Every structure is written in structure tokens, then in C-alpha cells.
Amino acid sequence: MMKAEQKVLKRFNKGCVDYHLLEDGDRILIALSGGKDSLELVRLLAQRARIYKPHIEVEAAHIIMDNIPYETDRSYLQDFCAENGIKLHILHSSFDESTDPRKTRCFLCAWNRRKTLFEFAVNNGFNKIALGHHMDDILVTLLMNITFEGSHSTMQPSLPLKHYPLTIIRPLSLVHEADIRQVAEELHFTKQKALCPYEETTRRADMQAVFQHLERLNPEARYSLWRSVFMV
């Protein structure tokens, strides 16, 4: 096992234990976008499912938005899941912009993706949905919420949903993006080339630059930010 793999696995295991993400009897549905983070999440949870305790079942779902002009490499995702012993479900969804012209395409797309994912999970006996957000995602979201919303909040490692009998888990919560990127390169993950033409990235990209600047000022900045949210 390579050094980056070891670091990711160690932090993945620590996150699962510290935040009680995996319990005996869990049926977990992974939201597989096709990016490096969700691919690594499939690989790690597939390995974890082969361990006797806790006994968990893991499958994945990839959602295609029928009215958005982009497409991922579906055959690669199917092959990747098969190689890891994970069943992949291909789900279709769409949205009608005219239903609420005040909402952006990105909001409507994300809302409908999640609704499709949640309903499929409930109807097929899953009790948890695993998302591929890592520590960098969580801390950049924190900075965005502080800067633009005046809210000291961010995504949680574990979040029970109010309107569905489901819990959202983020097993990569303690994993650094740089380590996932290194694993993706070493294991030759195929990068998805077709990007959504409507993707809104400017604000998040700006906050990522702020986060990187904070780490240059203080190499321990990420841990200080993390403690400010999760260890108060």
C-alpha cells in the first residue's frame, strides 16, 4: 500500500469511528458522481464491507439529469463498481425551471438529485447515504457560510434527515483532498471530462483560495478551523 493510500485509509477509519458512521446492519447507498472523491469513497467502503464487523451492505447510485447537456463516462463507473464488488444503480431525474424562476439551475438540479437519491434509498431499504465530501470541502463551506451568511456552520460528518428515515454520512470528513488526489493519480482513476455548463464555481473557488492562503499563513489552520466547529 502506498503512503497516500495509508494516510487516506487511516483518516477514513478514524472518521468512521469518531463520528460513529458505520453500525452493524447498515445498508449504505453511495452517491457516485464520478469524481475522484466519490470513486475513492466507493473503494474504501467496498473494502470496509468485506470486514466481518460491523456488518454493512454497500451499493452505489449515479444520477443522470436528463435535461442537462453533459454526461459522465457511465461504462467506466459501472466497471469501477464491478471491480470493487459494488452494485451500481443508474437513476434518471430532471427539473422544470418554470416551477420557480427565482431558483437557479444549480439549486434546482441539486434539489432534484437529492430528492431522487433519497426516494430511491427509502424505497430500496437503505438507511444511510454516503457522500464524498472531505475535510477541505467542509472547511471551505464553513468559510463561505461565515463570509456570506454570517453563520458559523458547515456540513456535518453525520446528519439524520428530518423528512426521510435516512442519515447522511460523510466518511471522508477527516481526509485531506491532496491525499485523495494523490491516490487518484497513483491508482489511475479516470477523470470525468464532461462538465456541467451551468456549474457555479466562482464563490467556492474564491473561498478555496482563501483557505489555501490561511494554510500558507499557518500550516495548522485547517485543524484550528475544524476545532472551532466540532470541538466546542
Residues of each region from the PLM?
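Catalytic subdomain that performs nucleotidyl-dependent activation
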Residues: 136-216
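Short, structured secondary-structure boundary patches
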Residues: 48, 107-116, 149-154, 206-223
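ATP-dependent adenylation/nucleotidyltransferase module used to activate substrates
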Residues: 1-143, 148, 178-186
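Short, surface-exposed helix-loop/turn micro-motifs enriched in polar/charged residues
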Residues: 94-97, 131, 195-199, 221
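Alpha-helical structural motif
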Residues: 4, 8, 73, 176, ...
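Residue-level detector of flexible, active-site-proximal loop/helix-junction positions
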Residues: 65-67, 95-97, 159, 175, ...
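A short, charged, Gly/Pro-tolerant segment at domain boundaries
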Residues: 202, 220-232
